[in-house]
């Protein structure tokens, strides 16, 4: 079915005979991989042609896409400004958006598939954790890491995802009239750009007209999540710090992106008690959130703004961190609550920069999200010109 189809992999996936750099110069002297990552091997066995390892943020630790070592891919939707390609699967999204590849595979720990897809006007699917075999993939957070395809259409994501999992069964469209969606009314729309809001509301009207039942609902559990972040910390930080401890406390730190070093070291302020408390409270909050969602799908803007000019972010570290946090806000909610998610283009703003809609559901409901996306993609993308 996919024999001869080109595919490329974010530079976290081991490709036999090639050094996996994870976007960092500090790994350039590592020995080449002796074996393919599990998914790379699955793609090859299906006849897919692995043609490249793709650019990314150093160690996958940002939603902006900046890489001072190997260069930051240009967002193809602006020929003048060097806008953010999104991160951390920046090269994966740009390669697909430019038409260089039909599909690329990325990873997502806080939004790193869905954000680049949104900024570049393509489809990005973040699977549930454990949905794909992670063997041979350089980690960031063993609790939160997940994988998924970036492609031009939902159908392409479904097709490639099925092959990489070695499945014979297919995912088909859901009956639109049986769908129930929830729009969160808190957190996710704070500071949203006008065009993102307008395109989102227009997409809601179209899918409502098609038969989807829409309910708007406040999620107090979101407020609890952000309060937990403020008072205790997050899951990702300590896991990244443990992984990179020797790098950020040794000579390698001077060769790393200072933004990445600073972000990793932020977790030093968390105690072991804080980390355990976050893990325990996370499970309770996931259960509470799932009870709020029940059988519905959560729909929201993938990110509150379109891709931004990267120059000010390169020059001002404080601005970089503030922008990164806002960019990741909506998607990282999904990672914390262990959702799967599908980003679909919803239109453009006055500068022809893409906006995006995100469909999400609790862990293990990947088929529901993808089948809903198959049914609704053409309606959501109507007049998107992407």
What is each residue range found by the language model?
Residues 2-25, 82, 176-178, 234-286, ...:
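Short helix-loop capping/hinge segments that flank enzyme active sites or metal/cofactor-binding pockets
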Residues 243-336:
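Serine-dependent amide/ester hydrolase catalytic core
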Residues 8, 27-31, 145-152, 265-270, ...:
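Short, well-ordered beta-strand elements within core beta-sheets of diverse protein domains
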Residues 178-187, 217-232, 257-269:
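Flexible, acidic loop-helix segments that line cofactor/substrate-binding pockets
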Residues 20-29, 193-194, 308-316:
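Glycine/threonine-rich flexible loop motifs
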